[in-house]
Amino acid sequence: MKRRQFIGLIGGVTVVWPLAARAQQLERARRVGILMSTAETDPLEVASVQAFITELAKLGWGQGRNLDLSVRWGAVDSQRMKAEAEELVSLGMDVILAKGATVPSAHQATTTIPIVFVSLPDPIVEPLVGSFSHPVGNITGFTTYEYGLVGKRLSLLRDLSPRITRVLYLRSRQTGVATQSLLERVMESARAAGLSVTDAPAQNPADIDRAIQMFASSPDGGLLVAFDAFTGMHRQVIVEMASRYRLPAVYASRKSAGNDGLCSYGFDQDQQFREAASYVARLLSGSKPSDLPV
């Protein structure tokens, strides 16, 4: 497997060390793996990784100084995510940061290496942690808790276009316990609001185009975009299709709104990566995942 090492100089300072000091630095270096669910060609995802690295450096852990960072990209491919997670484990990481859809792969790959997750809808439903306040096992992190936001997004969609009676729910075709649970919440919230829902699982841009085009052929519709690796990777396509067919849309990710999407209601991914850096720093300093609440 081709290995990709994410090397960054934090602070812009290069120091020439004596050989003995270099050896000591290498001995003290800790290994942190970063497992991303999308592709390395996505500048907004790269920005989230950089936010994590920058924050970690502020906390005293810098690449090339006392830290060895490895980044792997899953490219919204479950088999690749699994392989990348297994490779990070084989390389002997001290801590793994895993995003969204990669978390189950990381969790399956190791029960001993501490894992910090980000952008995960519900680690209880998966199930991964057992308890928010006292996580069980080798994993903890930061959840987006999408369930509590569904009703807000539907309400916002109604505010954008009061005549809406139908909603197209666009999501990844990849299924899981959390995916199904979130779909049920969307259906329940929509019924309570007097809206009908068309579920649109997709696995490529053609699916997105087809689903939006067919749905937009009838009036009084709106688009609700799920927060997952697939919609994140193809957010520009989704934004363009919604605009082309004049479909009011609400996105779960702020990054989609930044791509000229009409409106979003969700968390700040870069900020969550910064917060995750504090957990990684504590784990590197000896804390256990069970000490760090979700």
Predicted regions and their residues:
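Short hydrophobic alpha-helices and adjacent helix-cap/hinge residues
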Residues: 1-294
